[in-house]
Curated annotation (Swiss-Prot):
Higher taxonomy: Bacteria, Bacillati, Bacillota, Bacilli, Bacillales
Membership in a protein family: Belongs to the SHMT family.
Keywords: Amino-acid biosynthesis, Cytoplasm, One-carbon metabolism, Pyridoxal phosphate, Transferase
Purpose of the protein: Catalyzes the reversible interconversion of serine and glycine with tetrahydrofolate (THF) serving as the one-carbon carrier. This reaction serves as the major source of one-carbon groups required for the biosynthesis of purines, thymidylate, methionine, and other important biomolecules. Also exhibits THF-independent aldolase activity toward beta-hydroxyamino acids, producing glycine and aldehydes, via a retro-aldol mechanism.
Organism expressing this protein natively: Shouchella clausii (strain KSM-K16)
Uppermost EC category: transferase
A Gene Ontology cellular-component term: cytosol
Protein name: Serine hydroxymethyltransferase
EC number: 2.1.2.1
């Protein structure tokens, strides 16, 4: 980055310091990951210069013959990864992928059944402060209070009562496997469409480690980062059942409906990431993500930290801090101060406000990319517990900092940057 260093020292320094943060801290935010240098090279390429409104072979600009190749490669690889008949890789984010589906099949005020945000859902699944909750009439389903798992019978009853046009499955803070087949059965019973937002688990689905929603859902949306380990972006997929009826409508909803020109440098980076995800090495990586999450959860429980639902089936864990008399806000700050990055997160039936919360969410995708295994999960679990139990003990916290530094030095990040 010699040109940037000379031309804009302020931005260069911000990037340099962020690289240092990623190298020196243990990244446990469940929605984050470390992409390959090949993905970063594609995203930082000359494709950022090219406007390409439209779709391959149907552009509103000339000179698109090479960006067409990149987009076709991305679409073909995504179809292969997930067994989809239709793919749109142009959404700039997961939120815009969701918006594209909503705009395709819903009218203002239509009823939609989605997961309660505090039970693990997402802002775009009907939060009243989000466009989804403003534009449409969302009703909520959630988890049982006793075991914190989705209550499918309650989902069925809510669907029968409210007769939604669309049911949304998928979550941003739900640590258990979701039964998409059961969701489709419920949708069929009430004549609703089913959309699955698999943003958090897409990499696990691609590796065959979680039920694939594509055969069951009318529409599947995802981000391309998180467990899929690509650039930040979104994507829509459909199976053969709905591709013929809705493919062109979905394309029009994205462009010209809610977006203009696609980000061709990001789409190229998506293509690279999808190629990586097709490899045997990625399958091994995804298996390790889950093994690490399970091991970390077991260690935290052994250290006396409560885990929502008692464990995990995927990459994330939700910690209930009430028994430690801590809030998520306090815990996030304390952990960050010793070099462990997490995020405060509401737990089901949380008595605290959304900016305070009673929990923190952690995930293992990024640390697994770094090379951490189950032995490192034991140490991280111990370090988290030590921190949470000794928030005012500076001697104990300094010991944690030293151990974090030793651990991160053992597994260097981006040594060539």
């Amino acid at each position: 980055m010699e040109h940037l260093k000379t031309q804009d020292p302020a931005v260069f320094e911000a990037i340099r310091q962020e690289l240092g943060r990623q190298r020196d801290k243990i990244e446990l935010i469940a929605s984050e990951n470390f992409v390959s240098e090949a993905v970063m090279e594609a995203q930082g390429s000359v494709l950022t210069n090219k406007y390409a409104e439209g779709y391959p072979g149907r552009r509103y600009y000339g000179g698109c013959e090479y960006v067409d190749i990149a987009e076709d490669v991305a679409r073909d690889r995504a179809k292969q990864l997930f067994g989809a008949a239709y793919v749109n890789v142009q959404p700039h984010s997961g939120a815009q992928a969701n918006m594209g589906v909503y705009f395709t099949i819903l009218e203002h005020g239509d009823t939609v059944l989605g997961m309660n945000l505090s039970h693990g859902g997402h802002l775009t699944h009907g939060s009243p402060v989000n466009f989804s909750g403003i534009q449409y009439r969302f009703v909520e389903y959630g988890v049982r209070e006793d075991d914190k798992r989705i209550d499918y019978e309650a989902v069925r009853e809510a669907a029968k009562t409210h007769q939604p046009k669309l049911i949304v499955a998928g979550a941003s803070a739900y640590p258990r496997e979701i039964d998409f087949k059961k969701f489709r059965e419920i949708a069929d019973e009430v004549g609703a469409y089913l959309m699955v937002d698999m943003a958090h688990i897409a990499g696990l689905v691609a590796a065959g480690l979680h039920q694939n929603p594509v055969p069951y859902a009318h529409f599947v949306t995802t981000t391309t980062h998180k467990t899929l380990r690509g650039p930040r972006g979104g994507m829509i997929l459909c199976n053969e059942e709905t591709a013929e009826e809705f493919g062109k409508k979905l394309d029009k909803s994205i462009f010209p409906g809610i977006q203009g020109g696609p980000l061709m440098h990001v789409i190229a980076a998506k293509a690279v990431a999808f190629g990586e995800a097709l490899s045997d090495e990625f399958k091994t990586y995804a298996k390790q993500i889950i093994a690490n999450a399970k091991r970390l959860g077991e260690k935290l429980q052994a250290e006396g930290v409560d885990i929502v639902s008692g464990g995990t089936d995927n990459h994330l864990l939700l910690l209930d801090l009430r028994s430690l008399q801590l809030t998520g806000k306090v815990a996030e700050k304390a952990l960050d101060a010793v070099g462990i990055t997490t995020n405060k997160n509401a737990i089901p039936f949380d008595p605290e406000k959304p900016f305070v919360t009673s929990g923190i969410r952690i995930g293992t995708a990024a640390v697994t990319s770094r090379g951490f295994g189950e032995n490192e999960m034991d140490e991280i679990g111990e370090l988290i517990a030590l921190t949470l139990k000794n928030i005012d003990n500076e001697e104990a916290l300094n010991s944690v900092r030293s151990r974090v530094a030793a651990l991160t030095k053992t597994f260097p990040m981006y040594p060539n940057l």
